[in-house]
Design a protein with these regions (language model features):
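Residue-level detector of structured alpha->beta connecting loops
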Residues: 26, 51, 72, 184, ...
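Metal-dependent phosphoester-hydrolase catalytic domains
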Residues: 41, 48, 76-79, 119, ...
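Active-site environment of divalent metal-dependent phosphoester hydrolases
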Residues: 11-13, 37-40, 157, 197-198, ...
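Structured beta-strand-rich core segments of catalytic domains in phosphoester-bond hydrolases
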Residues: 36, 44-156
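A long, amphipathic alpha-helix that forms part
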Residues: 162-184
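Short, flexible loop segments at the rims of nucleotide/cofactor-binding pockets, characterized by
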Residues: 6-11, 88-90, 164-167, 211-212
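Active-site beta-strand/loop signature of hydrolases that rely on acidic residues for catalysis
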Residues: 3-7, 22-40, 146, 176-200, ...
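Short, acidic/polar
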Residues: 12-23
Length: 286
């Protein structure tokens, strides 16, 4: 099975590029972040024509996550237990944002759940999936519990959004502990945009990030805690590169990037990984 993750930054804007990428890379399931649309606005028909069923979670034009699969899609969850809520402004009602989506792909995943967030594939259609950083478990016959995650940005170290980010990661850690305690042999993949650079070499110049989010000690400790909870980042030893380059200030041509997109896997998932890649070519487009 070929898994992948991609912060698509508007699925409606880039649907043609996404579908072309899926076909070219021949990947089975794609975790998408920043889809930036509600379920009824998602281009489901285009994915279905390519042979993918899609689970979608989006509340408005912000955030949004989705999973496209050609190997089955079942047990869809639009949040993880204990996922913190966020109030966009003072006095506003706090809501659980569209930042996490889980589904079982591969094996006997089946035809998905009975929800408008899932569209079954058309019979006989072919397809694939892929993106920024993804492992390749060897056997398509065994299911994987895949989560598409878009971790809060944090904004500034003194901003409430930063504390929200840390609380979000801590709640996720508790879920991982519980999931693996209930099923130690579960093939679990947490893929997405983590908005954290765990190591100094994951940014082009640490001096630029002095006193900023994404590289702070508490954020890095939060990701390290996932390892202690039983997860391994499965792409690190197989590929070295950045996964994100700001569109401003010619960051991409200068290779002034960050590595913030990762796939954290359980022991069962990590044992099946045979390779990984980061597709810089997709960043060359708009």
């Amino acid at each position: 099975m070929r898994l992948a993750t991609w912060n698509v930054n508007s699925v409606r804007t880039r649907v043609d590029r996404i579908l072309a990428f899926l076909e070219r890379e021949n990947v089975d399931a794609l975790a998408m972040q920043e889809t930036k649309c509600r379920p009824e606005q998602f281009p489901l028909e285009a994915f279905a024509a390519a042979g993918y069923e899609v689970a979608v979670h989006g509340l408005n034009q912000w955030n949004g996550v989705a999973i496209a699969s050609r190997v089955g899609l079942a047990d869809v969850a639009t949040s993880f237990p204990g996922q913190p809520a966020w109030a966009a402004k003072e006095g506003a009602e706090a809501v659980v944002e569209a930042r996490a989506l889980g589904a079982t792909v591969g094996g006997s995943a089946g035809a998905g759940s009975s929800t408008d967030r899932v569209m079954p594939p058309k019979a006989g259609a072919a397809g694939a999936a892929g993106s920024a950083a993804g492992p390749g478990p060897a056997a398509t016959s065994e299911p994987v519990r895949l989560w598409s995650l878009y971790v809060p940005n944090g904004r500034e170290l003194t901003h409430p959004h930063y504390e929200y980010k840390l609380a979000w990661l801590e709640a996720l850690r508790h879920c991982v502990i519980n999931w693996l305690a209930a099923d130690p042999d579960r093939a679990l993949a947490l893929a997405g945009d983590w908005n954290v650079a765990p190591r100094d070499e994951d940014v082009w110049d640490m001096s630029v990030f002095e006193g900023a989010t994404h590289v702070s000690a508490p954020e890095r400790a939060a990701l390290a805690a996932l390892a202690r909870a039983g997860l391994t980042e499965v792409t690190r030893e197989r590929v070295t590169n950045y996964t994100y380059w700001d569109y401003q200030r010619l960051r991409f041509p200068r290779n002034e990037g960050m590595r913030i997109d990762f796939v954290y896997g359980s022991a069962a998932l990590a044992a099946r990984v045979t390779g990984a890649a980061i597709d810089r070519d997709e960043r060359k487009g708009k």
